[in-house]
């Protein structure tokens, strides 16, 4: 790898560490020519499907957009950045596992909502209100009622 400081063609790896999720390798490098150190990150590049938008246009999958939209929904919520990264990684693995070359933006939105639902209910409602274009309070009430039904324990049967 070229040194970013002096452009020397060969650098030495001083230290390598695998990230907690095992998806990235962090390498500390040193240039023998200028003796400066720098860090590189190595990640497997996989071919994620293209995203088909509502208008039919196609765009490349952009991890940063998913992270940004989740961060916006989770703004001022007690969720760690690592949890967001892990959620985005799960979305990517689901897309890769599908084997599809294209994914509809609606499906991608549903995957994001599922991850937000598991992370933080407030963030889920925030995202859903924008994604599903809520127009009145009753739509918020419907989502909240879904949560109430899902979180309440089933009633015991009255069989004797």
Swiss-Prot record:
PROSITE patterns this protein is in?
A: ATP_CONE
- One of the record's GO molecular function terms: zinc ion binding
Q: Which Pfam families match?
A: ATP-cone, Zn_ribbon_NrdR
Write down how the cofactor binds this protein: Binds 1 zinc ion.
Q: Where are the transmembrane segments?
A: none
So which cofactors does this thing need? Zn(2+)
Keyword vocabulary terms for this entry: ATP-binding, DNA-binding, Metal-binding, Nucleotide-binding, Repressor, Transcription, Transcription regulation, Zinc, Zinc-finger
Q: Where is the ATP-cone domain?
A: 49-139
- Has the keyword Oxidoreductase been applied to this entry? no
The record places its unnamed zinc fingers at 3-34
Q: Might you name a Gene Ontology BP term for this protein? A: negative regulation of DNA-templated transcription
- Entry similarity comment: Belongs to the NrdR family.
Its annotated function is as follows: Negatively regulates transcription of bacterial ribonucleotide reductase nrd genes and operons by binding to NrdR-boxes.
Name the NCBIfam families on file: transcriptional regulator NrdR
Please report the name of this protein according to its UniProt entry.
Transcriptional repressor NrdR
State the organism of origin. Answer: Paraburkholderia xenovorans (strain LB400)
């Amino acid at each position: 790898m070229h040194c970013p400081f002096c452009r020397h063609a060969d650098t030495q790896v001083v230290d390598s560490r695998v990230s907690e999720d095992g998806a990235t390798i962090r390498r500390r490098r040193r240039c023998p020519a200028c003796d400066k150190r720098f860090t590189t990150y190595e990640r497997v590049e996989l071919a994620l499907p293209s995203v088909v938008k509502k208008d039919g246009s196609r765009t490349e999958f952009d991890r940063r957009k998913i992270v940004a939209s989740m961060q916006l929904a989770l703004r001022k919520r007690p969720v760690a950045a690592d949890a967001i990264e892990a959620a985005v990684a799960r979305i990517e693995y689901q897309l890769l596992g599908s084997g599809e070359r294209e994914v509809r933006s609606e499906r991608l939105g549903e995957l994001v909502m599922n991850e937000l639902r598991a992370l933080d209910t407030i963030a889920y409602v925030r995202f859903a209100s924008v994604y599903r274009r809520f127009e009145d309070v009753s739509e918020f009430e419907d989502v909240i009622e879904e949560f109430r039904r899902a979180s309440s324990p089933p009633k015991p049967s009255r069989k004797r």
